[in-house]
Amino acid sequence: MEAALAVTRLPPNDPRTPALSVVDMHTGGEPLRIVHAGCPEVAGPTLLAKRRYMRQHLDYIRRRLVFEPRGHRDMYGAILVPSELPDAHLGVLFLHNEGYSSMCGHAVLALGRFALDFGLVPAPPKGAREAQVNIHCPCGLVTAFVECEGGRSCGPVRFHSVPAFVLASDLTVDVPGHGKVLVDIAYGGAFYAFVSAEKLGLDVCSAKTRDLVDAASALTGAVKAQFKINHPESEDLGFLYGSILTDGKDAYSEEATTNICVFADEQVDRSPTGSGVTARIALQYHKGLLQLNQTRAFKSSATGSVFTGCAVREAKCGDFKAVIVEVAGQAHYTGTANLTVEDGDPLRDGFLLK
């Protein structure tokens, strides 16, 4: 009897703030913490307005989810919200150690499974092998396709991106400690700077992670200081999210190409980076290195996990020629939790060590 009571007894929680019920997943090693209950209402008529409201009024929720002691500086989170788009099954706000992203491919791959398994989309017809999940991200509507059996997710997920394009190609950037380097900037729902790690004196496959992070951070800072990022359709999307260092193998090959993404406040993506794969496919297509429906494999130098990507059709974003990119990968569940706040805890909203 006492053992049963011990199991069901909950930790104390400040009654002024509800506990956050979360489901934890990972995609290619990159974590995702999904809040499915307990978050206060996120006000705003549009998803981008909700993102601004979250930043201005509810940022303590992000810190509790992502920061220590409940998380860590490389944790990633997702808040599910209603969408104003009639075709969307759900809206999502993406959270990281510095703030709020416009797109996250690894999260979309995980959310596809979550939405199907937790009943956020209509059950697929009997015998269906794939379910469609329309996810409204801050960058726009992204469609996920979830392998399923008996109405439950059972395998890899793929998604079709928003229009992806190249903002600048072979841009000369003076990177502190590395001199002048030719850099590409491409958009896959978020803007990234791309460069072969070799140009920064590193091997992306064997260098220490700390050295890769330092080089990528120097590149990000230099691009931000020397080049203005503008999105053709929305001011909210006009910012550089991070830098992706590659092995330089951009020409089409059946062999996987390796990269590492460093984004936000030196946060290291453990996966190949879904929005980064999207942008890198757009870049390769722009340079004539890839044709429509040619699939490439992208490997994370952090974990060795692999996503695939291909340009499925041409599109436009403002005046930019763009492509819709299909990205595929495997997400896994890792646990559930109730994140509580005890009254009087001086570290209730979290902290980060660097």
Swiss-Prot record:
Catalyzes the dehydration of trans-3-hydroxy-L-proline to delta-1-pyrroline-2-carboxylate (Pyr2C). Gene3D superfamilies: Diaminopimelate Epimerase, Chain A, domain 1 (3.10.310.10). In contrast to the T.cruzi proline racemase enzyme, lacks the conserved Cys at position 273 which is replaced by a Thr residue, transforming the racemase activity into dehydratase activity. The lineage of its organism: Eukaryota, Metazoa, Chordata, Craniata, Vertebrata. InterPro entries: Pro_racemase_fam. Its EC number is 4.2.1.77. Transmembrane segments: none annotated. The gene is L3hypdh. Keywords: Lyase. Substrate binds at residues 105-106, 269, 274-275. Belongs to the proline racemase family. Homodimer. This is Trans-L-3-hydroxyproline dehydratase. It comes from Mus musculus (Mouse).
